[in-house]
A protein has these predicted regions:
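Exposed, interaction-prone regions of secreted/extracellular proteins
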Residues: 1-181
Length: 181
């Protein structure tokens, strides 16, 4: 990751349930913040919209750490959010209550928003890899390919790609996102 030389920038990498076709979203992942000079800090978080994200201070995440995430519906409005820093061997899990439409499953690399609205300047995160991406519904495991996953290219206000997903891997469970633009 490189600083832009002007201002603080950021990116977020997460998985979630809901949010594409509904206003509900339960998610967990990491946020990277990059100073103008290129100093990077990373935090782990979870979020239940419409509330703001909740940092996970018990996890010490470094930029580039391999992460594993799982969001499991335990029945009705009961959920378990699990996040692990595979590189460091740290884990976090919390049970929450949340009303979800279960409308979509998501694997996202994005430009986060300020709490007061508007987008944080987007950093050039390089490459984000997603592997083992599956969703389970009614006991049936579905891959990205099996679910008909749709790639979304993030563009800036000039129509230039700033985050571009790859094709889905041959096993149907992975892809990468390349930053820059």
């Amino acid at each position: 990751m490189a600083g832009n030389g002007v201002s603080t920038s950021a990116d977020a990498t997460w998985i979630g349930i809901g949010g594409v076709t509904s206003s509900d979203l339960i998610q967990t992942g990491t946020d990277d913040t990059v100073t103008a000079s290129g100093q990077v800090s990373t935090i782990a978080f979870y979020e239940l919209l419409p509330a703001s994200e909740t940092p996970i201070p018990s996890m010490t995440v470094s930029p580039g750490d391999a992460m594993s995430a799982d969001i499991a519906n335990l029945g009705g409005t009961a959920w378990r959010i699990s996040l692990a820093d595979v590189t460091r061997g740290e884990t976090f899990s919390i049970n929450v209550t949340y009303n979800s439409t279960l409308s979509t499953a998501e694997w996202i690399e994005e430009d986060p928003s300020f709490a007061r609205g508007g987008l944080v300047p987007f950093d050039n995160f390089g490459l984000a890899n997603f592997t083992g991406a599956t969703a389970t519904e009614n006991g049936a495991v579905t891959t990205l390919t099996g679910a008909g996953a749709q790639a979304i290219i993030m563009e800036n206000s000039h129509g230039q790609a700033i985050a571009t997903p790859s094709v889905i891997s041959s096993n149907g469970e992975g892809f990468s996102v390349t930053g820059g633009g």
